[in-house]
């Protein structure tokens, strides 16, 4: 992964990190953090494994503490970390929330329009991309619905990502990463998730950007 000289780093962009992961065949873990102790624990584990890490906050987390607070918390920890650390907005629920995290200094933004129809998802995603890219902040989007209950959203049974739609979505939005639904389930869910790896392979054939599960 990206080498940090001198053992001291600031927050890094997720784009270079995930492109390096894609090129070299490894995954980067992303963890929701909701207080100082969680931030410290995740970074300690990442350092023990000598692994880059993505720290992320969700819309419900930002309801009780502002994006500035969490940015300052993670940025302070990142300065002392000896591994690359990304600050990411997870499942951004609106353009306004995405911009709040962007202005706070987050180095990676997700806008989740997967609960909207295809064209609306494209529109809101492109609006966030157009706002973030001039400042070199990468954007993640989601297509299809991930099952289970994560944050304060219920994904239900989940709707699989269509490979052809994924290719069109990426081309029309210019998004940097795409979260896809292949049977994955996050948080609390019923039953045992069954991953459609063939579908993942088909998406990979037509989408060149890093994929998020």
Task: List PLM regions with ranges.
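Short, Lys/Arg-enriched N-terminal segments with co-localized hydrophobic residues
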Residues: 1-9
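Alpha/beta enzyme core
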Residues: 14-20, 35-60, 68-84, 92-213
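N-terminal amphipathic alpha-helix/helix-capping segment at the start of soluble metabolic enzymes
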Residues: 9-29
């Amino acid at each position: 992964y990206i080498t940090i000289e001198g053992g001291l780093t600031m927050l890094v962009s997720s784009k270079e990190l995930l492109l390096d992961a894609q090129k070299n065949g490894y995954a980067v873990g992303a963890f929701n953090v909701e207080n100082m102790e969680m931030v410290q624990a995740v970074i300690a584990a990442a350092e023990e494994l000598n692994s880059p890490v993505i720290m992320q906050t969700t819309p419900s987390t930002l309801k009780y503490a502002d994006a500035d607070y969490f940015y300052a918390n993670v940025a302070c920890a990142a300065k002392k970390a000896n591994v690359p650390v990304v600050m990411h907005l997870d499942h951004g629920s609106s353009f306004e929330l995405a911009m709040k995290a962007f202005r706070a200094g987050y180095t990676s933004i997700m806008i989740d329009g997967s609960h909207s129809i295809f064209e609306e998802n494209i529109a809101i995603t492109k609006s966030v991309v157009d706002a973030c890219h001039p400042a070199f902040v990468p954007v993640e989007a989601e297509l299809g619905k991930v099952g289970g209950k994560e944050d304060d959203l219920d994904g239900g049974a989940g709707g699989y990502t269509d490979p052809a739609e994924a290719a069109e979505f990426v081309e029309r939005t210019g998004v940097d990463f795409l979260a896809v639904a292949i049977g994955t389930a996050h948080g609390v869910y019923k039953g045992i998730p069954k991953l459609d790896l063939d579908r993942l392979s088909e998406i990979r054939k037509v989408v060149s950007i890093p994929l998020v599960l």
